């Protein structure tokens, strides 16, 4: 391994993109157990639970679907992170095995460039609104600072809270996995306290019976419950399309495959059991108690009389947003941007570039057209499902779990593998799978497929790539060789 690292350094690759040595792979089971809790318990996910009630499913069906989703998510995170934990290599480099050295740039930029940066900016803005609530609870006069002053549509209090929250997120991004790990270790028990406490509060207010009987006003019980049950699972799993693609950005730090597999599985299942119970109890209980459908946990917290309880709950919600932003957005963006010019850019350069772009896009302006921006991001997310299918089929079926690192860390300008650095089979399969999974958003008769788009994209891409891809002497990327 040390000989390989020196060779790759001579080719110009930065330390951040090199394979991790065994001594650098320090993450154990507990590190992975705590990693994703904040990504499960955040404001958009709780709002999503409210959307599930609109489908007309029972409370029990929604809870069961959410819990089952955890097993699908864990399986994909573990399997697509297997190469990372075996070779200590980040996603940006692993992607080269299946799409080619040059071809990897397109799906990589979709994930680490466009989607990650836009979501980073949007999450920073959403978090700044919670931050505004937090400061306003303590210092009401803060909300009127600056009078009518605005900058690019933001009031002075809004601008201050956005910049504060943005800087905190950027700081976590610069710290990378080490800082994130310490942060999530603190966050986890706080999540149990806040969301577990909110669930108990809701049950104590209205009782468990009414919660299980809850149906939003004007909604009829679903007739095609079986398909809608699958739609709920797809919706929960699809949220993880981007993190699952870049799972190797975190599994590269794993001490072993077993530890990342056990840690991620236990962490996600436990997190989603709590989320399933807390989500339906909080949303249904609050809606019954306040006499109106209330699906945003921030709206619920603002109604509380206790200043301390409100302050602590909003603080933890802010922390979950930071955790989600780090694991899902800024860290993958940092690695992917560094991979665009591996001889010139480092991970921290990538974080800085992504952070600045997230400011320049003015996310508060994007939120003025929420439907359009979320449709755009949903389409990008839908493209990543097929990428997962191709990556897993290539690694497990075509290459049988073996990667030739020398062919991933080629010298600049060396595109001898695949067709001038592009795996055309991977791109063809991805295109077909994307059309099948997202076509329903534009073509009416395909609409049922789009409601389970993640499953369609992953399964079609995996099966098609595994069947079409043949190992030839011309295309051997991923074969294990001895490097002299």
UniProtKB/Swiss-Prot annotation:
One of its GO terms (molecular function) is symporter activity. The gene is ybbW. The keyword Methyltransferase does not apply. It catalyses: (S)-allantoin(in) + H(+)(in) = (S)-allantoin(out) + H(+)(out). Uptake of allantoin into the cell. The chain crosses the membrane at residues 35-55, 59-79, 114-134, 156-176, 191-211, 225-245, 266-286, 307-327, 347-367, 373-393, 426-446, 448-468. Induction: By glyoxylate. Belongs to the purine-cytosine permease (2.A.39) family. The keyword Transmembrane helix applies. This is Putative allantoin permease. It comes from the Bacteria. One of its GO terms (biological process) is purine nucleobase metabolic process. Residues 1-34, 80-113, 177-190, 246-265, 328-346, 394-425, 469-484 are cytoplasmic. It is a multi-pass membrane protein. It holds the Pfam family Transp_cyt_pur. Keywords: Cell inner membrane, Cell membrane, Membrane, Purine metabolism, Symport, Transmembrane, Transmembrane helix, Transport. Its main location: membrane. InterPro entries: NCS1, Pur-cyt_permease, Uracil/uridine/allantoin_perm.
